[in-house]
A protein has these predicted regions:
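Detector for glycine-centered tight turns/loop "hinges" at secondary-structure junctions
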Residues: 101, 201, 277-279, 427
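AMP-binding/adenylate-forming catalytic core of the ANL superfamily
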Residues: 183, 292-408, 426-427
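Short, solvent-exposed loop/turn segments at the edges of secondary structure
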Residues: 207, 264-267, 333
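Conserved beta-strand termini and adjacent loop/short-helix elements that scaffold enzyme active sites
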Residues: 163, 240-242, 273, 370, ...
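Active-site phosphate/ATP/adenylate-binding loop shared across adenylate-forming ligases
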Residues: 4-6, 65-238, 246, 250-256, ...
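Nucleotide 5′-phosphate-binding alpha/beta core
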Residues: 1-95, 101-118, 125-126, 226, ...
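Conserved AMP-binding/adenylate-forming
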Residues: 220-221, 225-318
């Protein structure tokens, strides 16, 4: 059973009252300390905290995007103009890999780091991790924010075995010898290990592992993909999610498996917006949109209305675990999204449909856009890898094409490729050929 903290059972309306007060303090802090936000908010006519209108009016404020932060960086201030504290108050600086080769830096004060550990511990506890059990993790503790998550396992009181990324032999030796009850990894790596174990005669469903916690990329909440992982591991699969610039792990799924709860409640405020127009979307059962996050109690470099580029589905109905925060499932990244004749298509959604054809297919796919940019002309080419041993029945490509059209309302051209021809990953899968 998962451990539920008292704050997680608090009525959501009460939480919003607390958040409203914290938000007003955060706005005051930004206007006093952040040159970046003084300029951005000032250009929107907000020069005093009262001008912001409170949490109920947050949708009137400008978004913060990654490129805005990058543009504010200088040789003398490589972190960015949103930095609010002197260097001597910073205890940790993480970095994210930059698409241009220039990393982005994420500074934390001691209080910020403590808050990250708190939210991460909540999200991991939701999955059922508890004191005394052995957990093997594959997070890298190097320069990236996942390293901050390691302290969350200490907070939970588990026997934590960090093996890092890129060493499958070491990982599986730890599973064999130390007999953990849980493992933590990306969903792509969990899928890769099913094949790895099968090829080497390792009985993964017969191992000690009873829980697989996946994070780092979308996929763990897709019905067909989750079923594939649970069958291959003989274990319950739940997922967690964070956004490096905001918090390493902010959302965690409980054992009911009906979406990830906001473990970051009290520390971040979540909004839903239309990814194209930026218009607000009400957080209600079944709503879909881009996740936008705002720090509420951050000190080093708080972010206001940060566009995550994660496209999510939301649930606000009661959960059997008693947690009252909204729940989400990540459908995909809006920067991976393609538009085919006006229809938004996420590669992860195509993978989920293809996964319904197991055991005829391996479950691995690669979308191959033909036009530069987001807009694509139909049919959209998709490589689908066959299962090992040639289990496909006649007409498989047509059946997959028809199912995708029925489910996602998009026309595809299915190319069946031999087993083993699509790249596997010990970290995150590439679903789109760029």
């Amino acid at each position: 059973m998962s451990t539920v903290g008292e704050i997680e059972l608090q009525p959501w309306a009460v939480q919003l009252d607390h958040d409203a007060r914290a938000y007003e303090e955060q706005i005051s802090y930004l206007l006093a300390r952040s040159p970046f936000y003084r300029e951005r908010l000032g250009s929107a006519g907000i020069r005093q905290p009262k001008d912001a209108g409170g949490l109920a009016a947050i949708a009137q404020l400008p978004f913060t995007e990654k490129q805005h932060i990058r543009a504010s960086c200088t040789v003398d201030n490589p972190i960015g103009a949103h930095l609010c504290v002197p260097r001597e108050e910073i205890v940790r600086i993480f970095s994210t890999s930059g698409t241009t080769g220039t990393p982005s830096y994420i500074p934390l004060t001691a209080g910020d780091l403590e808050n990250w550990v708190t939210t991460s511990a909540r999200s991991y506890a939701a999955s059922g991790l508890s004191r005394g059990e052995t957990v093997v993790t594959t997070y890298n503790a190097g320069p990236f924010v996942a390293g901050a998550a390691l302290a969350a396992f200490d907070r939970l009181g588990v026997c934590h075995v960090p093996v890092g990324t890129g060493n499958t032999e070491r990982l599986m030796t730890a599973v064999r010898q130390l007999k953990p009850s849980a493992v933590v990894m990306t969903p792509s790596y969990a899928a890769y290990l099913i094949e790895w174990a099968s090829e080497r005669g390792f009985d993964l469903p017969g191992s000690s592992v009873r829980r697989v916690l996946v994070a780092g990329e979308p996929g763990g909440g897709e019905a067909a993909f989750r079923a594939r992982l649970e069958a291959g591991w003989g274990a319950r699969v739940t997922e967690a999610m964070g956004i490096g610039d905001i918090g390493v792990s902010l959302w965690g799924e409980c054992e009911a498996q009906c979406g990830m709860h906001l473990g970051g409640r009290g520390f971040v405020h979540a909004e839903l917006v239309d990814p194209a127009s930026g218009a607000a979307i009400a957080m209600a059962d079944g709503a879909r949109g881009e996740l936008v996050l705002t720090h509420l109690r951050h000190r080093a470099a708080p972010l206001l209305r940060f566009r995550s580029r994660d496209h999510v589905e939301v649930w606000t109905s009661p959960c059997s675990c008693g947690r009252t925060a909204p729940r989400i499932r990540c459908i995909g990244r809006t920067d991976d999204m393609l538009i085919v004749r006006g229809v938004n298509v996420f590669p992860s959604a195509i993978r989920d449909v293809v996964g319904q054809f197991l055991p005829e297919v391996s479950g691995f796919i690669l979308v191959k856009p033909q036009q530069r940019g987001v807009a694509q002309e139909p049919p959209l080419p998709v490589a689908v890898e066959l299962a090992k041993g040639g289990l496909a029945r006649a007409g498989l490509a047509d059946r997959i094409r028809d199912r995708i059209r029925e489910t996602l309302v998009v026309s595809t051209r299915i190319e069946l490729v031999p087993h083993g021809s699509l790249q596997r990953s010990e970290y995150k899968s590439k679903l789109v050929q760029h």
